[in-house]
Amino acid sequence: LQSGVVITNAFIGYRTYGTLNSERNNVIVFPTWYTGNHDQVAPYIGSGKALDPDKYFIVIPDMFTNGASTSPSNAEAPCQGLNFPLVTPFDNVAAQRRLLEDNFEISQVQLMAGFSMSGQQAYHWAALHSDLVLRACSICGTSKTTPHNWAMLAAYKSAFEATTNWQQNCCNAWDPKILKLVASIGATMAM
C-alpha cells in the first residue's frame, strides 16, 4: 500500500463483459464506488449503451474494502477487522493496473470511467497512467475528497457512534433507528 503496509494475499474482485480483441486495446475500466460492487454497474452495460460489450471488453474491478476485494472482513491477520490499514485511491488504482497487466496483458484503455469515489479513481488513472488511458470520465467524482464529502463522512461516523452497541470503534448489533439515520444521510447526499 501507499503507506508501506503489506496486506498478505491481497486480492481484487472483478467482473468482465465482452471480448478482449487481439490487440488488447478495446478496454473500458469502470471500478466500483464507495459501498458499491460490480453487480451494481451491470445495469449500465449492454448492447447499444456507452458501455457496450459487443464493442468493448469491460472490466469492473471492486474497490478494496467492499467485501468482494480484500476487506476488513476477509483479510488475513494481522490486517483483519479494526486492524485493517488505510487504503487510498492510489492503492486501488495500483491494484487495478496490476489486474489489467497480469490477468489480461492490456495494452491500452479506451475509457477509464467512474462514479463518485470511482470517479476519483478515474482522475487518478488519468494522472498516473496517461501512457495507458486514452480517455477518462468522472461522473459526480472529485479529484480529491472535498470538505462537503468530509462533512458527510463525519455525519456517518456520528450516527454509527450513537448506537448503544458501539464499543471501542466496533459494533456487533446495529440499532434499526441508526441504520435509518444512516440511510437518510446517504439520501440527502444523493440529492
Segments (PLM) and residue ranges:
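Alpha/beta-hydrolase-fold enzymes
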Residues: 132, 138-191
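A short loop-to-beta-strand scaffold at the N-terminal edge of the catalytic core in hydrolase folds
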Residues: 7-19
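Short, conserved beta-strand segments within well-ordered enzyme catalytic domains
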Residues: 13-15, 28-30, 59-60
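Short beta-strand element of the alpha/beta-hydrolase
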Residues: 24-35
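Soluble or luminal CAZymes and related metallo-dependent hydrolases
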Residues: 12, 88-92, 174-182
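Gly/Pro-rich cap/lid or specificity-loop segments adjacent to the active site
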Residues: 35-120, 124-127, 131-153
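Residues that flank catalytic or metal-binding motifs in active/ligand-binding sites
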Residues: 10, 27, 54
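Short aromatic-glycine motifs in intrinsically disordered, low-complexity regions
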Residues: 1-6
